[in-house]
């Protein structure tokens, strides 16, 4: 396969990017993900962060009250990111290496999100 035939992150990423404040409740984050039928939201902080459905489920499984928790209590910080011009095979390798399912796409600023579902659908 020539490089011109290869699929890049920009070809597949979800955009516009959905975000949520670090001060929102975890319950609000869960409701937003359900409404949008997505599994992760970017939290516009420095360092970069996301909150995923797994973060929410972990909090519930630990017996924590998600109505009282804020996104900053459960979010994943210092997340790996990818650039829009990265090839999907490289994204698959990153996800496998780091054991992650969502990668924010960054081109100076957030521009989208790529998920393991996107990778599987593209490479299968």
Q: What are the residue ranges of the model-derived segments?
A:
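Tandem CBS (Cystathionine beta-synthase) repeat/Bateman regulatory domains
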Residues: 1-124
